[in-house]
Amino acid sequence: KKQYGAQGRPQGAQRTPDSRLQPLGDLAVTDPSFDANAMQEKISNLYVQMQNCWTDKNIESLRPYFTDAFFTQMERQLNGLKSRGLTNHVDRIAVLGVNLRGFYKQGGDEHLIVELRTRIVDYTVQDSDKKLVSGDRNREKFMTYEWDMCRAEGSVTTREGAMQSVSCPGCGAPLSINTTAKCPYCGRVVTLDEHDWALCAIKGISQTTR
């Protein structure tokens, strides 16, 4: 089975239609501190960190920035590579553009739809002898993705690094959190998607190899 991992779903997925999206100006009505430039920088940095962690085969540090479901999906695919003795290398990473297209609300969540354009070198080798299994060590891939960032509806942007006082959704205990926290009472890990934007899905829109 093909492992898409950090590169998202198979290429050729359909973009979220513009007709479904509200403009970012509407988001500022309920979240006046939302900063589009800061969000673009955050997403750009997260993309690079995500590729590096994927190559290192350790994504634990990404847990606060993913929803539980997306983290589990990524972890399952990474474990598949480990079990077969393979490493997927993602090198020469560059983020060429981050476009915040708009947002929509569904099921009590807000979804921020983001289009990323990136350049990478993507190849997979056997751990035992470094033999190339797939991809190319030299040819560059120019990728277009759609990222879906989500958070609970009604959440507001907090000052960078600020601690938020929240209640554990598992047992109701009070917690202080800026990225992630483990509840000392019930053991649940509270991540940013419950209080701030977290990555919940990736679509691969297009790919060109040069």
For each of these PLM feature ranges, what is it?
Residues 9-93, 170, 184-185, 189, ...:
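Core segments of small alpha/beta cavity-forming domains
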Residues 163-169, 178-184:
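Cys/His-enriched microdomains
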Residues 1-3:
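Alpha-helical transmembrane anchor segments and their immediate juxtamembrane flanks
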Residues 48, 60-162, 177, 191-210:
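Structured, amphipathic secondary-structure segments that form assembly/contact surfaces
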Residues 125, 169-171:
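A short, polar/proline- and glycine-enriched secondary-structure boundary/capping micro-motif
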